[in-house]
């Protein structure tokens, strides 16, 4: 079997126009895959220089393969099973700024550089006041980026045509706003002056983005078969689902410079990221949170099996299409398409997503993902959404513990104060006390949910039904 490098595989030389902070599975299977498709299908013609954001990382592994690797997409596409392998050739080189700081800083001197993309984890966009301008490099990602921007400003004497377009991909709501704020903190801490601040404001753009693709990562279980198929000894294969979405809160002139739409990619440039964030939380995370306890207490362990179950499948459909979708303000057809994509993702034959892994911290999840929908539905329709109410009753039942009908032990996991509260309430043996006690817990909900008209009575009725008839019969009663 051949080693994978530029001697054994074709690698096109393209202008270095993108600096990418992060070399992990997600960026390589999402951003670099998107850039590969843009290079193939448009005149984007750009390569990526990867910068390792922390001192330990995968730069050496990448360089050993001349920065070539394969993406293995697996899942359903319009009902068809897809399992494809693509060699990604967009990374020109990978740098470790902790050992190659001069080369890192020289990236700022390249006139063709135009974009910065990052994924340094949720903890990556943070202000560290101990960072100094003369550090080689600054320890934080925003510190390194400020060093780079300041060097570029000086190199080109404040030329406003040499600004950079910055797309953070960290999983933080309004990540661009947070990154920009942190850069301003470094400008002030390091006294970089008003001229630089004005150049940064006017020549550069830091844009909030929302990313969505499940990336399981290195396919340990299938790697021998994959290597056999590609005939390369690729140690950086990364597996991902087919679905991808990148929402970028930026004007159309930025979209023209980053023409992902012309490559047929699901990359949207929008005036506000917020409705898309709300859509994802409501239609992807919201159903996950309620389907998991309903499925588990019905004896179903995997998300895909729950979707395909005769009764639970109808429950999930009801919650998504009849309840949660009714609470969002985006165009109906767009929401329907997104919900159908979500169901296809839940049905992915290659991913065994255990419902128990979703049930960790179910109460806070319900509060952020499902409760807003329950309230909006009540406000708009004048009645409670039965599926979301049953989902809450299922969570409360799950936290009772005990064993399922098949003998499997029920082991809830949440913050100690939530676990203690549920233990005390269930010890009373009274579903009215359990319901009212949970709904009154302001440390969970930020308010007393007993004040929502009819909610306590509806949850109690579902709890009683689950105790008497079991989960499946209770679900059938609301369909």
Curated annotation (Swiss-Prot):
Top-level taxon of the source organism: Bacteria
Entry annotated with the keyword Isomerase: no
Enzyme class per UniProt: oxidoreductase
GO BP, one annotated term: mannitol catabolic process
Keywords, in A-Z order: NAD, Oxidoreductase
TM annotation in the entry: none
Cystines in this chain: none
Annotated residues for binding of NAD(+): 18-29
GO cellular component, one term: cytosol
The protein's Enzyme Commission number: 1.1.1.58
Single Gene Ontology MF annotation: mannitol-1-phosphate 5-dehydrogenase activity
Pathway terms, separated by semicolons: Carbohydrate metabolism; pentose and glucuronate interconversion
Reaction(s) catalysed by this chain's protein: D-altronate + NAD(+) = keto-D-tagaturonate + NADH + H(+)
Family membership noted in the UniProt record: Belongs to the mannitol dehydrogenase family. UxaB subfamily.
Family annotation (HAMAP family): Altron_oxidoreduct
Protein name in the entry: Altronate oxidoreductase
Organism: Bacteroides thetaiotaomicron (strain ATCC 29148 / DSM 2079 / JCM 5827 / CCUG 10774 / NCTC 10582 / VPI-5482 / E50)
Name of the gene encoding the protein in the UniProt record: uxaB
């Amino acid at each position: 079997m051949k080693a994978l490098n530029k001697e054994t595989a074709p690698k096109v030389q393209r202008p270095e126009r993108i600096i990418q902070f992060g070399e992990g599975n997600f960026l390589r299977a999402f951003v670099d895959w998107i850039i590969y498709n843009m290079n193939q299908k448009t005149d984007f013609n750009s390569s990526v220089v990867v910068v390792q954001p922390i001192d330990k990382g995968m730069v050496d592994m990448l360089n050993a393969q001349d920065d070539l690797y394969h993406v293995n997409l697996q899942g359903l596409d319009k009902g068809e099973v897809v399992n494809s392998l693509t060699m990604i050739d967009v990374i020109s080189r990978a740098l470790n700024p902790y050992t190659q700081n001069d080369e890192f800083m020289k990236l700022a001197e390249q006139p063709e550089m135009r974009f910065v993309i990052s994924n340094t984890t949720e903890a990556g966009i943070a202000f560290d006041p101990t960072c100094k301008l003369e550090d080689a490099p600054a320890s934080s990602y925003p510190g390194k980026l400020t060093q780079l921007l300041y060097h570029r400003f000086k190199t080109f004497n404040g030329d406003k045509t040499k600004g950079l377009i910055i797309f953070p991909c960290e999983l933080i709501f309004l990540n661009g706003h947070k990154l920009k704020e942190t850069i301003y903190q470094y400008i002030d801490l390091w006294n970089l002056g008003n001229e630089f601040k004005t150049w940064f404001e006017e020549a550069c753009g830091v844009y909030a983005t929302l990313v969505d693709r499940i990336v399981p990562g290195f396919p340990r279980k299938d790697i021998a078969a994959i290597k056999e198929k590609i005939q390369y000894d690729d140690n950086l294969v990364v597996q991902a689902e087919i679905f991808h979405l990148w929402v970028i809160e930026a004007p159309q002139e930025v979209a023209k410079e980053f023409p992902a739409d012309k490559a047929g990619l699901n990359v949207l440039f929008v005036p506000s990221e917020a409705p898309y964030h709300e859509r994802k939380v409501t239609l992807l995370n919201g159903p996950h949170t309620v389907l998991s306890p309903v499925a588990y207490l019905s004896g179903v362990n995997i998300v895909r099996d729950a979707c395909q179950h005769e009764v639970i499948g109808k429950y999930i459909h009801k919650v998504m299409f009849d309840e949660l979708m009714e609470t969002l303000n985006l165009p109906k057809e767009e929401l329907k398409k997104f919900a159908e994509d979500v169901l296809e993702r839940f049905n992915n034959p290659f991913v065994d997503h255990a419902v128990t892994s979703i049930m960790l911290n179910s109460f806070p999840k319900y509060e952020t993902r499902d409760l807003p929908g329950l309230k909006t539905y009540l406000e708009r329709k004048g009645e409670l959404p039965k599926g979301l109410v049953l989902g809450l009753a299922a969570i409360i039942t799950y936290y009772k513990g005990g064993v399922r009908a098949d003998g499997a032990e029920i082991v809830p996991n949440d913050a100690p104060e939530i676990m203690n509260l549920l233990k005390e309430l269930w010890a009373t043996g009274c579903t009215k006390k359990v319901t009212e006690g949970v709904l009154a817990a302001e440390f969970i909900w930020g308010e007393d949910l007993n004040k929502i008209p009819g909610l306590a009575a509806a949850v109690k009725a579902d709890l009683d039904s689950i105790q008497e008839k079991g989960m499946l019969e209770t679900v059938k009663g609301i369909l």
